Amino acid sequence: MTLAKPGSGSQSRMDDKAHFKSRVIRDRATFAEEELGSSDVSDPAMVAAVETLLRGIGEDPQREGLRKTPERVVAALKFLTSGYRQSLEELLNSAIFDEGHDEMVLLRDVSLFSLCEHHLLPFIGKAHVAYIPKQKVVGLSKIARIVEMYSRRLQVQERLTRQIAEALMEVLDPYGVGVVIEATHMCMVMRGVQKAGSWTVTSSMVGVFQEDPRTREEFLSLIRHPSNF
């Protein structure tokens, strides 16, 4: 039998605690670096601006929980506004095809999030996008990418809806485009009137979707139909 030296158990527990604390600190540092991402998002002016905002609300940017917050906010804003650094040409990358299809193509329930340009608070929802091709069709994923590109900018929902429709008209020259967006706005939920559960619905109808009531009704009927998935 091995006899433990007096106090050795206490020392062992202290060593274990020190090791655990060191590991937690390392894990937090690793998590922070991963959250910031590997791409270079450093922007001293933006970081300084976030620090100024933190001081303005009475916080200390140098306290432990906030030391990396300015960099994280800058990284998040760059991601949420990445649509400014994209173009339709690069996005589509020649994914337009001659198919001779002339019936409605509908991509519904495309999830989206964007930042309201008035308060920089998010609005979150889904888009339904349809078009009737003359000759050219586009890969379905590219429609979702177009929604994403315009969403990742400072926006108002009305303009976002119109921009998606105009983009498809520009690249496909179809008989028409219909876009409906349903979204809930945090600027109405977290502040102001504070109405949780309210939704804003906007539409943009171009070409036959505006001119032909039957085409418009077919589109609206299809997006009202419950999904089977």
UniProtKB/Swiss-Prot annotation:
Gene3D superfamilies: 1.10.286.10, 3.30.1130.10. It comes from the Bacteria. It holds the Pfam family GTP_cyclohydroI. CDD domains: GTP_cyclohydro1. Keywords: GTP-binding, Hydrolase, Metal-binding, Nucleotide-binding, One-carbon metabolism, Zinc. Residues 1-21 are annotated as: Disordered. It is an enzyme of class 3 (hydrolase). It catalyses: GTP + H2O = 7,8-dihydroneopterin 3'-triphosphate + formate + H(+). One of its GO terms (molecular function) is GTP binding. Its EC number is 3.5.4.16. GO terms for cellular component: cytoplasm. PROSITE patterns: GTP_CYCLOHYDROL_1_1 (PS00859), GTP_CYCLOHYDROL_1_2 (PS00860). Pathway: Cofactor biosynthesis; 7,8-dihydroneopterin triphosphate biosynthesis; 7,8-dihydroneopterin triphosphate from GTP: step 1/1. Zn(2+) binds at residues 116, 119, 187. InterPro entries: GTP-CH-I_C/QueF, GTP-CH-I_N, GTP_CycHdrlase_I, GTP_CycHdrlase_I_CS, GTP_CycHdrlase_I_dom. One of its GO terms (biological process) is tetrahydrofolate biosynthetic process. Belongs to the GTP cyclohydrolase I family. Toroid-shaped homodecamer, composed of two pentamers of five dimers. HAMAP family: FolE. This is GTP cyclohydrolase 1. The gene is folE.
